[in-house]
A protein has these predicted regions:
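Conserved beta-strand in the GNAT
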Residues: 61, 67-75, 82-87
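Conserved GNAT-fold acetyl-CoA-binding loop/helix
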Residues: 13, 23-50
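Conserved N-terminal entry element of GNAT/NAT acetyltransferase domains
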Residues: 1-16, 161-163
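Active-site acidic-Proline motif in GNAT/NAT acetyltransferases
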Residues: 76, 89-91, 95, 123
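A short helix-loop-beta-strand connector motif used in the catalytic cores of GNAT acetyltransferases and
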Residues: 49-61, 82
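Conserved GNAT acetyl-CoA-binding A-motif
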Residues: 109-121
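Conserved catalytic-core motifs of GNAT/GCN5-like acyltransferases
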Residues: 118-122, 133-155
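Conserved acetyl-CoA-binding loop-helix of GNAT-fold acetyltransferases
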Residues: 88, 94-107, 134
Length: 163
């Protein structure tokens, strides 16, 4: 993949690359198969579901020229901005795309006067925990999916300086 400047933009009504976006998420989350239990909710996503998600939430895509290389969905909550489905194509992991999308989420939180970013990551994904910690997130809770008696995910938050 030729490296061009990465452009982060919001998903608007003109976005029509839903199948490509679904493929990106599935490929970015594929390494979790057989590692996390229960399996990732990404497996339940559909093209229609993603389009609905984009209408209900605020989506961002990362573009390398005309190539879709990342995405992030944000959902404003009462006291925070929830971040979900942060995905980067596997061959671009570690290239700063995720951090750039996080910066877009931080700008959105500032614009909405939301002082905290919140996300959830699976207990087993310790590399993700370390990455989010480097980005300023701290562990705030452990949660269990329905039917599980052990923690299956952790919540992490990042406090933002508003002003």
């Amino acid at each position: 993949m030729t490296s061009m400047p990465i452009r982060i933009s919001s998903i608007d009504e003109s976005f029509d690359r839903w199948e490509e976006l679904l493929s990106l998420i599935l490929s970015a989350f594929a390494y979790m198969d057989g590692v996390i239990d229960p399996p990732s909710s990404a497996h339940r996503l559909t093209v229609e579901g993603l389009a609905h998600k984009a209408r209900e939430e605020i989506g961002f895509v990362a573009m390398n020229g005309d190539t879709l290389v990342g995405c992030l969905f944000c959902r404003p909550e009462a006291e925070c901005l929830y971040l979900g489905k942060l995905a980067v194509v596997p061959e671009r992991h570690g290239s700063g795309i995720g951090r750039r999308m996080l910066a877009a989420a931080e700008d959105l939180a500032h614009d909405r006067n939301l002082p905290v970013l919140r996300l959830e990551t699976r207990v087993e994904l310790t590399d993700n925990h370390r990455t989010f910690a480097r980005w300023g997130f701290v562990k705030t809770a452990e949660n269990a999916h329905p039917g599980f008696s052990r923690p299956t995910s952790i919540e992490m938050q990042k406090r933002l300086a508003l002003g």
